[in-house]
Amino acid sequence: MTALTQPVRLPFVTTDLDVLLRQVAERDVDAFAALYDRTRSRVYGMVTRVLRDPGYSEETTQDIYLQVWRSAGSYDPKAGSPMAWLLTLAHRRAVDRVRSEEAASQRESRYGAASVDPPVDHVADSVILLDERRRVVDCMGSLSDLQREAIQLAYYEGLTYVQVSERLSANLATIKSRMRDGIRGLKNCLGMS
């Protein structure tokens, strides 16, 4: 018994599929229809085994035959049988489809995770806001009357320094000085210095 050390190459044999592929390369529509009829079940089967989804498999099989129509001239009969060439195209296209779908799914997951706003605890936010307001009101009580009035008019009613000085009938420089001192006092009281 002799061991085979080299792969055995079968002599080149022309088949009906070889002839059909050559005719398809010349844009023969009837030859394309015949090639499709003879090979579609095996090509579709290969694609379905990879994709496991009938809808995607049908679409991918259609893409494969479009590729066959466009590139039948690139088939080299010396490299393998027409069926091997078709099944190689089918397998590659199906694997490409799987990779494409996985990449799209990952992009959607990343987008979804990035675009979801973190949950907001409205109760906690309300409690914090009420506590901050209470602290500010308590600290405002530690200011002089002129400081407190000037800050209330400027920050709560939105008046300018000039408008505050007119409303309180006080010099503009005095108002600015009292507000600066009042804000410094609030910062100290609130522990923000």
Curated annotation (Swiss-Prot):
Keywords: DNA-binding, Sigma factor, Transcription, Transcription regulation. Gene3D superfamilies: 1.10.1740.10, Winged helix-like DNA-binding domain superfamily/Winged helix DNA-binding domain (1.10.10.10). GO terms for molecular function: DNA binding; sigma factor activity. A motif (Polymerase core binding) lies at residues 59-62. It holds the Pfam family Sigma70_r2. Residues 35-101 are annotated as: Sigma-70 factor domain-2. Residues 140-187 are annotated as: Sigma-70 factor domain-4. Transmembrane segments: none annotated. It comes from the Bacteria. One of its GO terms (biological process) is DNA-templated transcription initiation. Residues 161-180 bind DNA. Sigma factors are initiation factors that promote the attachment of RNA polymerase to specific initiation sites and are then released. Extracytoplasmic function (ECF) sigma factors are held in an inactive form by an anti-sigma factor until released by regulated intramembrane proteolysis. Extracytoplasmic function (ECF) sigma factors are held in an inactive form by an anti-sigma factor until released by regulated intramembrane proteolysis (RIP). RIP occurs when an extracytoplasmic signal triggers a concerted proteolytic cascade to transmit information and elicit cellular responses. The membrane-spanning anti-sigma factor is first cut extracytoplasmically (site-1 protease, S1P), then within the membrane itself (site-2 protease, S2P, Rip1), while cytoplasmic proteases finish degrading the regulatory protein, liberating SigK. Belongs to the sigma-70 factor family. ECF subfamily. Interacts transiently with the RNA polymerase catalytic core formed by RpoA, RpoB, RpoC and RpoZ (2 alpha, 1 beta, 1 beta' and 1 omega subunit) to form the RNA polymerase holoenzyme that can initiate transcription. Interacts (via sigma-70 factor domain 4) with anti-sigma-K factor RskA. The sigma-70 factor domain-2 mediates sequence-specific interaction with the -10 element in promoter DNA, and plays an important role in melting the double-stranded DNA and the formation of the transcription bubble. The sigma-70 factor domain-2 mediates interaction with the RNA polymerase subunits RpoB and RpoC. The sigma-70 factor domain-4 contains a helix-turn-helix (H-T-H) motif that mediates interaction with the -35 element in promoter DNA. The domain also mediates interaction with the RNA polymerase subunit RpoA. Interactions between sigma-70 factor domain-4 and anti-sigma factors prevents interaction of sigma factors with the RNA polymerase catalytic core. PANTHER family: ECF RNA POLYMERASE SIGMA FACTOR SIGK, RNA POLYMERASE ECF-TYPE SIGMA FACTO. This is ECF RNA polymerase sigma factor SigK. It comes from Mycobacterium sp. (strain JLS). The lineage of its organism: Bacteria, Bacillati, Actinomycetota, Actinomycetes, Mycobacteriales. The gene is sigK.
